[in-house]
Amino acid sequence: MKANRKKLEIAMAKACMNTEDLQGKSGMPRPTVNNVISGRSVRPRTIGEVAKALGVDVTEIIETEN
């Protein structure tokens, strides 16, 4: 599962968070957060934890196929 980078950046901006803030709030290691932000494939649970930390529904930040 991948995060949509633009949607993720918008959610981070709305939450007034940078990468370090997201790392702290999600409790995930920096490389994992960087993988999510970079659009690399990660486990669904990881995307879920990021969405939870940002206070958004996971569907708002995932990459969807057209």
Task: Map each language-model feature to its residues.
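A short, Lys/Arg-rich alpha-helix, primarily the initiator
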Residues: 1-21, 25
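Recognition helix of helix-turn-helix/homeodomain-like DNA-binding domains
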Residues: 27-42
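Short, basic-rich loop-to-helix N-cap that marks the start of a DNA-contacting helix
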Residues: 39-52
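Short C-terminal boundary/hinge segments that cap the last helix of small helical domains
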Residues: 55-66
